[in-house]
Every structure is written in structure tokens, then in C-alpha cells.
Regions:
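Conserved P-loop NTPase "ATPase switch" module shared by AAA+ and STAND
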Residues: 245-271
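Walker A/P-loop-proximal flanking segment of P-loop NTPase domains
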Residues: 25-136, 143, 149
Length: 271
């Protein structure tokens, strides 16, 4: 709740309202169309739209940053790793701002509903592979999931989530422990010595996943489940992973740009 209070103060300072930058839609009057018969005997109708077509600015107002020329395209490439570190622009870090600028498509809604049902123990697919072309919204969809299940969201501030909850058969958002694995951000040659795991060194992507989950769950001692495998540079067995996930559950593991990670370790001895 404290984090959301700080976010609300930031939104009020930046946009003048705790509800954020939701643009007010100006509904233009219906477009007028002049219709006339070209000839009495051919039955052809001619339409004159031209001068009666309203400007797009009269139909929909752009966000203030776009209207004022403050929009920088480079800042708005979705970066899941950046958001998980608490970095990047507020429009991605703040759940209220993120969902205010996100149109929830039917495909995204289906993903969110399926995931919420799984996390809340109501079925749902345990593994979902997002298949879209470049720029198709995979990272954006994962960001939506990330914000939804980490806790601290006030649904009354995000109207677009209410239909999602209803479809999932839930009254409130379930909370999960989240691990974010982004191939472009991970460095397979660099080991990690987390302060909360003084006895261990994180060496592999499996170790990174376990480290994030046990940290989120507040159970750092559980890292011992995968520590031997991580130290030897091999993947944990299925029983070890099952024990880890059950002990830290419910869990959400988001994996993005794994091809980039595979390229880093291809042909490198010891990796």
C-alpha cells in the first residue's frame, strides 16, 4: 500500500490527478453525409464526405506528452528487465499509468484470465508460449501480467482490470512470487553474489530464477534446493524444480528474449 501511495502522489504531481494521465475523450458530433442521386434513371448514389469529416484531434485527444512534443520513441520500447529493476519511464513502471495507456485486446485478455485462474488454483494452463511476430505485443503482455500479480494494485484505480477479474471468476487479484528472465539483460559469464544469500553464488539462468523466487517469497534458505546444480552448471532435476516451485508458490516465471541468451552461450566453453 505504501508503494501505491507514493505512486499516487507522483501521478498527482505530474498529471494533476491521482488517477493519472487518462486522456479525456472528446466525442465529436456525428459525421454529416450529403447524399444525392446522380441521375434519375441509374440508381447510383453519390456521397460527399470531404468538408464534413472532422479532424482526428476533434475525435480523440492525444496524451499530453505527445501533444506537447515530449514523447521520445526510444523511451517507449517495452523492457521487462528494466521494469523489474524499478527503472525506466513511469508509464511502464506504474501499473495505473501502464494500464491507462494499454488497450487490452481479446488475445491479451485471454492470457490474463488464463494466468489468473492458474495462479488462484482454478485451472488454467501451467505453461503459455506467446507466439507473435516482432512488435506483436509479447513483452507488453508480460508486463501486464507482472503488474497484475505482484500485489499492491488497487483495482478501483484501473477500470480495465475489472472485466478481466469477472471473466476469471475472481473478486480480487491473486498475488504471486515473480521471476523475470530476459535474455538480453542476463550475462552468462558474470556470477552474482546476492547479499541475502551469503553462502551461495548464482551461476546459471536456473540459479537466477531460483534466486528471484526465494527472494520474492522471503525464503532465501530454499535456494539450497538448486544450489548444487547451479554450482555445477547444469539444470536442476524435475523433482528439485517441483519442490522449489511448490515451496515458493504460487509463482509466475516470465521469460523473454531467450534466443538472445542462447546466442551468448553458443560455442563458449564452460557455458
Amino acid at each position: 500500500d505504501g508503494v501505491e501511495d507514493i505512486r499516487a502522489l507522483y501521478r498527482k504531481s505530474r498529471y494533476g490527478s491521482e488517477e493519472g494521465s487518462v486522456a479525456a475523450a472528446t466525442v465529436a458530433s456525428p459525421t454529416q453525409t450529403k447524399t444525392s442521386k446522380a441521375k434519375a434513371n441509374d440508381g447510383v448514389m453519390t456521397h460527399s464526405f470531404g468538408q464534413h469529416l472532422p479532424s482526428w484531434r476533434d475525435v480523440m485527444q492525444p496524451h499530453p506528452d505527445v501533444a506537447e512534443g515530449r514523447y521520445r520513441a526510444a523511451e517507449f520500447a517495452a523492457d521487462l528487465a528494466q521494469v523489474s529493476r524499478g527503472e525506466g519511464v513511469i508509464e511502464y513502471r506504474d501499473p495505473v499509468e501502464f494500464f491507462a495507456r494499454t488497450y487490452v485486446t481479446e488475445g491479451m485478455a485471454g492470457l490474463l484470465v488464463e494466468s489468473l485462474q492458474r495462479i488462484s488454483g482454478q485451472g488454467g494452463e501451467p505453461v503459455i508460449q506467446l507466439k507473435t511476430a516482432f512488435g506483436g505485443g509479447k513483452t507488453h503482455s508480460m508486463l501486464a501480467l507482472y503488474h497484475m500479480v505482484r500485489g499492491g494494485i488497487r483495482v478501483d484505480h484501473i477500470p480495465s482490470l475489472k472485466p478481466i477479474l469477472e471473466r476469471a471468476g475472481l473478486q480480487t487479484l491473486p498475488k504471486a512470487n515473480v521471476a523475470v528472465l530476459v535474455g538480453t539483460a542476463l550475462d552468462p559469464t558474470r556470477k552474482k553474489n546476492p547479499a541475502n544469500l551469503p553462502k551461495y553464488t548464482v551461476n546459471t539462468i536456473w540459479g537466477e530464477m531460483a534466486y528471484q523466487l526465494v527472494t520474492s517469497a522471503g525464503k532465501p534458505d530454499l535456494y539450497a534446493i538448486v544450489s548444487d546444480s547451479d554450482r555445477r552448471g547444469v539444470s536442476p532435476g524435475s523433482e528439485a524444480l517441483k519442490t522449489l516451485l511448490n515451496s515458493c508458490g504460487p509463482c509466475l516465471i516470465l521469460m523473454d528474449e531467450l534466443v538472445a541468451y542462447a546466442k551468448k552461450i553458443y560455442g563458449v566453453d564452460g557455458l
